[in-house]
């Protein structure tokens, strides 16, 4: 059977590996290096990838593309994208669909197309080594990549001529690599993955099951717009400001100077991991009317650490959340594994050690571990390795908007994937012919404060009173973390489904804010939930009150009808405001008016021998108004589609 290769498609560097026998081989590229710069250049009609593209970057800044992974699956308007626009020498543009693309030589290119060039290089590297055609691969992505970003990565693979058999999370792949030759029994590890453009942390349990290994992800957290590029940019910003003070020239306006600064900043950052100071010397960086300008600035390790201290601090909060979600403390962690080139920085290692209370492992190559793990997963899928079971998770809650604007979770965050879950909902109005289903991702109670992934409609629902139709909504998330949602009318069997293909990705700020907001605004969420519940109970009571007056007919006096109508109007007015206590008071007032009426009607019906099936509690509102058959059914807020066909 043909080999399934493992590819780490990185922001700064990429790597390819394959399992041979019982060992994983990290494959050297044509230049003899085990990693390849994730850089693509367009020059004289030729496409350069890797080291050759990097070498000519200074002389061809506008057509040399790097850190493209930061754009994949993202909207042009994302704050994170806007921030990068001023820091890269190439041109980021807004595509027709609103996504962030790039423009090279007047040609618009999608990030998927550009990433495909890197994947082609990885594919060719593997083919040259194996001496056979490679068509299948496992590709890694940051654990916090959302549906759109995962879809875009699969599309890049397809463009590169690869059948992507599985998308797996980078920290999980690193744990696979770490656990491959470790036979030390059960252990819980933390994988801290600070790469070129993204940060992830996963808490993973490695269990020994009769000689086989089970790698189970307990929780994951992260930041999809935090990585080595941000460390470079912090140093670049400092150099630009220092030069501006000395020479009164803004280097950001010069693409050539910006590219030279980028190269120098990256080199200086690496040097400062092993030395206390370095000199950045860029002669003829620019020129003005007074002549050429030279940039000579000394940078100490302490200065760099001061510039990036906030970036390092931003990685610790996700670690805290991941531990909390896993139900563990730092003392439960046996090993801390560092992955990603930026994790080599002494300050990063120091802060990680301080947080976890133990020195990180030094026996895992941070540049190669992810590709090694991907190759192991590829071997599992091809049948070449059968002693490893991988259980990954989805990073954020998935649900739909229900009555009152509430997000009703279908699949909770940190659920093991693949997973399929269903819940039954109903209509919000009598004779409602269709329902709109809005799918959200996030941790807030109010649906619209989360990320809308997509929506679709289920129509042709037979006329029926509200609460009677049974609409089964199913969420199916596959092993790649890609979601499919379906809705089925249980009475007719009619079904509608959607493969979630959002045009935009979740920005780092959005994802981090979702979880942080959910914790920081717990009280606000509780109040909103209480308000939504009060409104739902009020709406149910109003509906049953109107039905009671209509059904009882002449058994209700005119004065009683007036009292009910007045109380209904007052309750309707109360539901339009945000005062929970007022809604509850008006609800109770309406119940107090209704109870004597329905009780009297019930007694009269009993005396006449016709009380069978009549329940005075049916008009009390809240849950009491629901039929027994509807137990477990949640009212869903759907947009009513008016049927114009009379």
Swiss-Prot record:
Keywords: ATP-binding, Chaperone, Nucleotide-binding, Phosphoprotein, Stress response. Residues 603-646 are annotated as: Disordered. The modification Phosphothreonine is found at residue 198. Coiled coil: none annotated. Disulfide bonds: none annotated. Induction: By stress conditions e.g. heat shock. Residues 618-627 have a biased composition (Low complexity). InterPro entries: ATPase_NBD, Chaperone_DnaK, Heat_shock_70_CS, HSP70_C_sf, HSP70_peptide-bd_sf, Hsp_70_fam. The keyword RNA-binding does not apply. Pfam families: HSP70 (PF00012). One of its GO terms (molecular function) is ATP binding. The keyword Phosphoprotein applies. Belongs to the heat shock protein 70 family. PANTHER family: HEAT SHOCK PROTEIN 70KDA. Acts as a chaperone. This is Chaperone protein DnaK. It comes from Acinetobacter baumannii (strain ATCC 17978 / DSM 105126 / CIP 53.77 / LMG 1025 / NCDC KC755 / 5377). The gene is dnaK.
């Amino acid at each position: 059977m043909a080999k399934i290769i493992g590819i780490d498609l990185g922001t700064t560097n990429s790597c390819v590996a394959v399992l041979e026998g019982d060992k994983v081989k990290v494959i050297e590229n044509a230049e003899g290096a085990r990693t390849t710069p994730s850089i693509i250049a367009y020059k004289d009609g030729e496409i350069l990838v890797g080291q050759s593209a990097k070498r000519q970057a200074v002389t061809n800044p506008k057509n040399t593309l790097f850190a493209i992974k930061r754009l994949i699956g993202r909207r042009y308007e994302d704050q994170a994208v806007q921030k990068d626009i001023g820091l890269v020498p190439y041109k980021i543009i807004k595509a027709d669909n609103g996504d962030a693309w790039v423009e090279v030589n007047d040609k618009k290119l999608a990030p998927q197309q550009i990433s495909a060039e890197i994947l082609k290089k990885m594919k060719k590297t593997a083919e040259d080594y194996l001496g056979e055609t490679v068509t299948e691969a496992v590709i890694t992505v940051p654990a916090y990549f959302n549906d759109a970003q995962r879809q875009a990565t699969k599309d890049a693979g397809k463009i590169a001529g690869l059948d992507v058999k599985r998308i797996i999370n980078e920290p999980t792949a690193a744990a696979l690599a770490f656990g491959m030759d470790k036979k030390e029994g059960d252990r819980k590890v933390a994988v801290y993955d600070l790469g070129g453009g993204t940060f992830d942390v996963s808490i993973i349990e490695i269990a020994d099951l009769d000689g086989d290994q089970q790698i189970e992800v307990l929780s994951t957290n992260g930041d999809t717009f935090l990585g080595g590029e941000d460390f470079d940019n912090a140093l670049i910003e400092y150099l630009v400001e220092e030069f501006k003070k000395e020479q009164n020239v803004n280097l950001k306006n010069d693409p050539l100077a910006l590219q030279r600064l980028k190269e120098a900043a990256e080199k200086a950052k690496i040097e400062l991991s092993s030395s206390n100071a370095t000199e950045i010397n860029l002669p003829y960086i620019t020129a003005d009317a007074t002549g050429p300008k030279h940039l000579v600035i000394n940078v100490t390790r302490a200065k760099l650490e001061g510039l990036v201290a906030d970036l390092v601090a931003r990685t610790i909060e996700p670690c805290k959340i991941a531990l909390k979600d896993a139900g563990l403390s730092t003392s439960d962690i046996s090993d801390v594994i560092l992955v990603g080139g930026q994790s080599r920085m002494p300050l990063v290692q120091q802060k990680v050690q301080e947080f976890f209370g133990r020195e990180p492992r030094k026996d895992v190559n941070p540049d190669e571990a992810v590709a090694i793990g991907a190759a192991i997963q590829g071997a599992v899928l091809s049948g070449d390795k059968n002693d490893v079971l991988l259980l990954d998770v989805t990073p954020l809650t998935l649900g739909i908007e229900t009555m009152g604007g509430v997000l009703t979770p279908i699949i909770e965050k940190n659920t093991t994937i693949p997973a399929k879950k269903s819940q039954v909902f109903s209509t919000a109005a009598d004779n409602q012919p269709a329902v709109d289903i809005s799918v959200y991702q996030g941790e807030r109670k109010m649906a619209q404060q989360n990320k809308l992934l997509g929506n679709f409609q289920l129509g042709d629902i037979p006329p029926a009173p509200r609460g009677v139709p049974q609409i089964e909504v199913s969420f199916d998330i596959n092993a790649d973390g890609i979601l499919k949602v379906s809705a089925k009318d249980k009475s007719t069997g009619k079904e509608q489904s959607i493969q979630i293909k959002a045009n935009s990705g979740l920005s780092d700020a959005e994802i981090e804010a979702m979880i942080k907001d959910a914790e920081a605004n717990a009280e606000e969420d509780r109040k909103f939930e209480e308000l939504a519940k009060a409104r739902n109970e009020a709406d149910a009571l109003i509906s049953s009150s109107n039905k009671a007056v209509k059904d009882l007919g002449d058994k209700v006096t005119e004065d009683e009808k007036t009292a009910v109508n007045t109380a209904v109007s007052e309750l309707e007015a109360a539901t339009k405001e945000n005062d929970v206590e007022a809604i509850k008071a008006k609800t109770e007032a309406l119940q107090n008016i209704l109870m004597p009426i329905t009780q009297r009607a019930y007694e009269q019906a009993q005396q006449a021998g016709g009380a069978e099936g009549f329940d005075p509690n049916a008009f009390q509102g809240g849950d009491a108004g629901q039929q027994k058959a509807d137990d477990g059914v949640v009212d869903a807020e759907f947009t009513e589609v008016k049927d114009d066909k009379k």
